[in-house]
Structures are given as C-alpha cells and as structure tokens.
C-alpha cells in the first residue's frame, strides 16, 4: 500500500502539480514487477524528503497522455521536475541511495 505521503497524479492534474518546487514522479503499472519492488523505496523517499520535495506516482495504464508526452517507453521510470521543468530521468529499478543522490543535486 502506498504511503499517505506519496501523491497520486493523473493526466488532468500533472501540469499543475509539477509546476512548483521539486517533484519526483514514479511512472508505474500494476502488472510491472520492478515497479512493485520500487514502491517501498518511493514511499521511503516521500517520508525522507517531506517538506523538501513532493513524491508522486502515476499509473501509466490509467493515464496514458503524460507518459506519451515524455516518451516513457519502459517502467518504472522516475522523472524529476524542478519548477515545472524536467530536470532528471531515472529509468529502471534503482537503489534508494541513487535516487536520493539525484534529489540532493537539485535541492
């Protein structure tokens, strides 16, 4: 189960939710094994960075428009936005420390 600190983004709220601050978005799907393995890491990052960065998930099956716009071909993919601009792309299952280091570079 997702942490209550992890937001859920949709095609309709994505642009407004990523427009300000540092926002990490996990693109995932129910059927994706690596996505399920990444979920606890995403939950932990949401807790660790609470107040400094927003952490969110976006189901690619339920929301196809945004993943298409960013040419997401494989999941899990994490996109990091800073004030509405794409700052970093992380593809595949990565350790928490690597994702945290990416966040730290933009704080």
Region locations from a protein language model:
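N-terminal "domain-start" segment that seeds a small globular fold
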Residues: 1-16
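Conserved acidic residues
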Residues: 10, 59-61
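Structural micro-motif
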Residues: 23, 64, 70-79
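Typically the conserved alpha-helix immediately C-terminal to a functionally engaged Cys/Sec
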Residues: 36-50
């Amino acid at each position: 189960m997702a942490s209550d600190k992890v937001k859920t983004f949709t095609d309709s709220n994505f642009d407004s939710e990523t427009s300000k601050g540092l926002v990490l978005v996990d693109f995932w799907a129910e059927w994706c094994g690596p996505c399920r393995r990444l979920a606890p890491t995403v939950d932990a990052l949401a807790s660790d960075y609470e107040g400094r960065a927003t952490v969110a998930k976006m189901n690619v099956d339920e929301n196809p428009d945004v993943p298409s716009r960013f040419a997401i071909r494989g999941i899990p993919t994490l996109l990091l936005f800073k004030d509405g601009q794409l700052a970093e792309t992380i593809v595949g299952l990565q350790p928490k420390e690597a994702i945290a280091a990416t966040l730290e570079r933009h704080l």
